[in-house]
């Protein structure tokens, strides 16, 4: 079924922004209003001003619901989103011989392609479906920019101008677990004799890998120091973390049935080589991101629920609080309220949590403290309900999903049309 609003919505929105004269540098290129200029200054330039030079890209992110005031500013990502939308929409065509990218105020020029011309290029299509472009995909450069962090030059140009998220929504930054051991003193929770310092299940983690919502591998760690989750081989402590960590590798993408999904997953792998470090103890589960690719997470210790939570590089963050989980479990037994969630979910390369179903994500890693998992299973048995925790959804055969929804706005067909439909 065609999306009648995708391409048309971008076209109408952009024309309205040009006519508003609210964005410096966003102007009509000719009197006929068939071409327009859009500012294209690199974030690493010394005179880069985020409020001015990224204003139109920010506006698109706001319009699409990808940014709201108070969120961390990511101008490079905003720019990539709009560029991808423009390049993949049949309504726009870059006029490279008019673009000026090597001047002090660089800009690109785009032409608005008339609908009749689109029909000639694509062939006759049903009315209202002209915004659909067969087999339109995000190019490799767009995918790469969306899944990795901005370059060092871009970052240095943004640090003084990018506001941080509100303090209330920032995860607590903790001392490095793999350099400095945490202090003792977590109060015990009454009523749980097993809840003590020496319970081995505190340090063990059950790690489950999901590609496109399908379980592809699982491991249970045993090392007290934690584990290194990466693509690399062990034996490189200086580059990938302390040598005493248990290596846990991502499963191969070879088993993914869809060729396109395999391609994009492997592309994402290229930015995850250094991986993340995981540590579990009686306080909870902690994570330290080392890889270039962006990693988002959810867990009961994450401050802001229901919005994307990105892990910053080289910061140790608590994502699961065992003490809080035990208190909520006590409440469950006392009042038959909702069973607390024992899971931490790491999402690689895509924003999370968001409105996109878990089954639609390229790479998800579910982490559970073995002790908390055992308590959940016992609670389920005692209530005669089996496991009360919903599993990550498996994709349904006839569902159609797309990679990077709202980014490649003109692509209205699913990439994966095999028996098992997966959005990535």
From Swiss-Prot:
Keyword Manganese annotated: no
Free-text disruption phenotype from the record: Mice display an absence of interferon (IFN)-producing cells and show impaired IFN production in response to viral infection. Complete absence of plasmacytoid dendritic cells (pDCs) and conventional CD8(+)-expressing dendritic cells (cDCs). Mice display reduced autoimmunity.
Pfam family, one: IRF
SMART domains linked: IRF, IRF-3
GO cellular component: cytoplasm; nucleoplasm; nucleus
Signal peptide span: none
Superkingdom of source: Eukaryota
Tissue-by-tissue expression: Expressed in bone marrow macrophages (at protein level). Mainly expressed in lymphoid tissues. Predominantly expressed in CD8(+)-expressing dendritic cells.
DNA-binding residue intervals: 7-114
Gene Ontology terms, MF aspect: DNA binding; DNA-binding transcription factor activity; DNA-binding transcription repressor activity, RNA polymerase II-specific; RNA polymerase II cis-regulatory region sequence-specific DNA binding; RNA polymerase II transcription regulatory region sequence-specific DNA binding
Gene3D superfamilies xrefs: 2.60.200.10, Winged helix-like DNA-binding domain superfamily/Winged helix DNA-binding domain
Chief localization: nucleus
Induction: By interferon gamma.
SUPFAM superfamilies assigned: SMAD/FHA domain, Winged helix' DNA-binding domain
Post-translational modification: Ubiquitinated. Ubiquitination by TRIM21 in macrophages, a process that is strongly increased upon interferon gamma stimulation, leds to the enhanced transcriptional activity of target cytokine genes. Ubiquitination leads to its degradation by the proteasome. Sumoylated with SUMO3. Desumoylated by SENP1.
Subcellular location: Nucleus; Cytoplasm
Keyword terms: Activator, Autophagy, Cytoplasm, DNA-binding, Nucleus, Repressor, Transcription, Transcription regulation, Ubl conjugation
One example of a Gene Ontology biological process annotation: dendritic cell differentiation
Function text: Transcription factor that specifically binds to the upstream regulatory region of type I interferon (IFN) and IFN-inducible MHC class I genes (the interferon consensus sequence (ICS)). Can both act as a transcriptional activator or repressor. Plays a negative regulatory role in cells of the immune system.
Quaternary state and interactors: Interacts with COPS2. Interacts (via C-terminus) with TRIM21 (via C-terminus). Interacts with the BATF-JUNB heterodimer. Interacts with BATF (via bZIP domain); the interaction is direct. Interacts with SPI1.
Family recorded in the similarity comment: Belongs to the IRF family.
Designated name of the protein: Interferon regulatory factor 8
Protein encoded by which gene: Irf8
